[in-house]
Regions:
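Extracellular, repeat-based ectodomains that mediate carbohydrate processing or recognition
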Residues: 2-518
Length: 518
């Protein structure tokens, strides 16, 4: 055993460092988005990459539609997101198809005509189709209609302005609203209508001016009692690079004569420093009397190996004093699109894949938190990939430590030049002088290796006060014990033991600190 001590001792330290590195990788890739909020839980897959309707039943179950080639799958989940039932419908489906499903009644739109479940045409040449909770809106020939799912009759609601080809519906608790938006140059005009028995009643109208270089990309609105809020997402084209997006919000009330002002929003990154970038798929709603936005954005995450940036799901709450409070609702290295709120405690989104997209949810429901905490095969693979990437950093960090290693090597070479073969004799002062020179180099050039960025990235067990000096001295003691064992068991002379001491010490240190050097 003593003969093997010279490699067993440093090997134990290095293997322990690699194990801690892997454990840190597991911790990073499985980190919850925020306290008391679950990780993503996969509940299905779909072949399309856009909106999928969700219904919450009075009993607290969820009906989620997933799309496959020529097949609609309606899956029913309980409040713990355990699937309790499923039904499939054979209809032609692609990413343009929109479906109304209420109980067993199915009506769909193929971007041209509206059909019943048997494939019979109900309405031809319909430009737009809006499936809602218990009714359907559609646009045909510049007119907005309501389609009654029970008897398949159509009622004209309002004639839209020429050139207007889309509306934004909003299902309130008691009423159904829709918004029209018209943009001319940098003028944006918004009208809010309430659906009545006699058609549509305009309840609010306003206009905004945006920057002349910007164009409206998306709009949304929300109504709660008499409170009204608008969201505008604009894009400014750049002469070089990607277009820059901007988000604005305005708050007012129905019946108010005061013109609301657009407030530009910047979303702070709740998990990192600075702001979230490229917010998209933004929706606005009132949650517990407070205005809140749900969106996907690029923000900080430790689930990735190098960039520490990925698209995840976020909410932004706008307080009464105008403060913006962001919260992260997903934490994954994969791209997230089309986030959707199921209720106050659960959100859903698509995770893009090469052939199929995964449907995931996250929630504050304790049952979901527990269910989503299980490590998946993907978690293990991502943790292994991140660990191997960190090991690659260790190899590069070793190059930086040459500033330490070169000094004992130069000392040994110079002593051979001066003393020659006499150094092969057991000269204690030579060995200890070489060790002292190396240790002096580690302290003199301490800040070259132990940089501030390293401590910002490293875990807590490496960043306590004086940690770099404590680890340096502790590993020096281990290296010294292992080095001294070679004197009696392998008859190593002082030069070999000096070089071995420095090499073993460096390998042990970089196994712990190297992954966080850059």
């Amino acid at each position: 055993m003593r003969k093997q001590l010279f490699w067993i001792l440093p090997s134990i330290i290095i293997i322990t460092g690699i194990f801690l590195m892997f454990n840190q990788s597991i911790t990073d890739v499985t980190e919850q988005p925020e306290a008391n909020w679950s990780r993503g839980l996969e509940i299905g897959t779909t072949t399309v990459d856009k909106t999928f309707p969700v219904q919450e039943t009075p009993g607290g179950n969820f009906i989620i539609q997933t799309y496959e080639q020529d097949k609609l799958r309606a899956q029913i989940f309980n409040h713990e997101f355990k699937q309790i039932n499923e039904k499939t419908y054979d209809i032609p489906l692609d990413k343009w198809t929109r479906v109304f499903l209420n109980h067993d009644q199915l009506i769909y739109h193929d971007y041209n005509d509206i059909y019943d479940q048997d494939g019979d045409v109900i309405v031809s040449n319909a430009k737009r189709f809006y499936p809602l909770g218990s009714t359907i809106l559609y646009i045909k020939e510049n007119n907005l209609y309501e389609l009654n799912p029970d008897d398949l009759s159509s009622t004209k609601i309002v004639e839209l302005n020429k050139g207007m080809e889309d509306i934004i519906p909003f299902q309130g608790k008691k009423q159904l609203y829709f918004m029209t938006e018209q943009s001319l140059n940098n003028d944006v005009k918004l009208n809010i209508y309430e659906l009545t028995d006699n058609g549509a009643k305009r309840v609010y109208s306003t206009s905004f001016q945006i920057d002349a270089m910007q164009t409206v990309e998306d709009t949304d609105f929300a109504v709660r009692d008499s409170n009204l809020a608008f969201m505008l997402e604009t894009v400014q084209k750049q002469s070089q690079g990607s277009p820059e997006s901007y988000t604005y919000v305005a708050k007012t009330s129905i019946g108010s004569n005061r013109e609301p002002s657009l407030k530009p929003l910047t979303f702070p990154d709740p998990a990192g420093e600075g702001s979230l970038s490229e917010p998209n798929d933004i929706t606005i709603s009132y949650q517990n009397e407070t205005l809140q936005l749900l969106f996907s954005a690029n923000g900080f995450t430790e689930t990735t190996y190098q960039e520490n940036q990925a698209f995840n799901v976020y909410t932004a709450t706008i307080t009464d004093n105008g403060e913006i409070q962001s919260a992260r609702k997903s934490n994954t290295a994969k791209g997230t699109v089309d986030p959707k709120r199921l209720n106050n405690s659960t959100v859903m989104w698509l995770e893009q894949g090469s052939e199929r997209n995964n449907i995931l949810i996250s929630s504050s429901n304790p049952a979901v938190i527990d269910k989503a905490s299980t490590l998946s095969q993907d978690d293990w693979l991502r943790a292994l990939g991140k660990t191997f990437g960190m090991l690659a950093k260790v190899l590069i960090t070793i190059l930086a430590t040459t500033i330490w290693f070169i000094w004992p090597v130069v000392f040994v070479v110079l002593m051979y030049v001066v003393k020659g073969r006499k150094l092969d004799e057991d000269i204690s002062w030579f060995f200890y002088t070489g060790i002292v020179i190396y240790m002096l180099a580690t302290f003199i050039f301490h800040d070259i290796i132990f940089i501030d960025g390293m401590f910002a990235r490293a875990p807590d067990y490496l960043t306590f006060t004086g940690s770099s000096y404590i680890y340096t001295l502790f590993f020096a003691l281990i290296a010294f014990i292992a080095t001294q064992s070679t004197k009696a068991t392998h008859d190593w002379h002082a030069p070999a033991r000096i070089i071995y001491f420095a090499g073993a010490h460096i390998l042990m240190l970089v196994a712990y600190f190297g992954p966080y050097y850059f």
